[in-house]
């Protein structure tokens, strides 16, 4: 970008600039570009003080260059330029600068840097703006540690990101896949840390329980979003609609994430069971200390464990309602306080003749046994609660 309408140095008079301008204009009109006329006394002094003049010119050019780029710089604000034209007797629309003593490479670098910033701000992918809303959309009305209830609305990014009527955007599906994989990775890390021999017992405020809650909540939002996409695809009455919409891989990723969450739930139950066993041995060894309760012990109290187990049951029920939505189920009462277990009426993998040795057969058996896994986990939680009740009675 060239810098125009600038005096190179305050020592140059308007008369010298006007003379150079007239000489250059005459050369252009005649069509012959002659050698520039001899420099005046002021111009000779400029070349003697070239470093100082170059710095002044760069400073002035940078200032005017930034001003002329403003949107408010128009003909109405060009009062200073009009007065300068009257003083010099020429038009400032012509190129009348002495380019020999100006370092244009620095101006070019500055212009490229500014254009690079503008291009960087314009090239932001608009699809990525939903990342923050997707992960924190529901967090606005849920405080940390607050649990779900049946009336809590589940918001999805469909209100911020438009989903095509016939097919989901590849960027949208990629974003959901990345978030599901992130949930699975964090869940695996939490499970590994909890299974460490020196890990602290899980409490309501521990990082393991927080990851179980946050991971389940994020997974539920993703499942609800995918359900919207699948419902729109199936409404077209096309047999290839769902298979071609690109959600098959995402569905498997979601199921893998659900398995990791179940692994974390089981690890929490195992850690609580280990703490209960230790407390039971301590109670047996010190029978004289019957008056002490778990609340006064350094280890977490039974109330802490009870709240954690109740949260796990709540999260399992939440996953049940999302995973088995629209599937014909047969309710059956289990041993845990009359909680209804959702048992699928479809045949399992063995009845379908699937090969459990293959990855597809194993995956099919895992999918058909999801409700059974949830049922067994509820039974484990119920047994732990019974052990805690017995321990408090000792």
UniProtKB/Swiss-Prot annotation:
> Which GO CC annotations does the UniProt entry carry?
nucleus
The record's subcellular location field reads: Nucleus
Q: What induces it?
A: Expression is induced when NaNO(3) is used as sole nitrogen source.
Presence of the UniProt keyword Nucleus in the record: yes
Q: Which UniProt keywords apply?
A: Nucleus, Transcription, Transcription regulation
Q: Explain the consequences of disrupting this gene.
A: Nearly abolishes the transcription of FMAN_15221 to FMAN_15223 under PKS8-inducing condition.
What is the protein's known function? Answer: Transcription factor; part of the gene cluster that mediates the biosynthesis of fusamarins, isocoumarin derivatives that show moderate cytotoxicity with IC(50) values between 1 and 50 uM. Positively regulates the expression of the fumsamarins cluster genes.
This chain's protein is named Transcription factor
Q: Which species is this record about?
A: Fusarium mangiferae
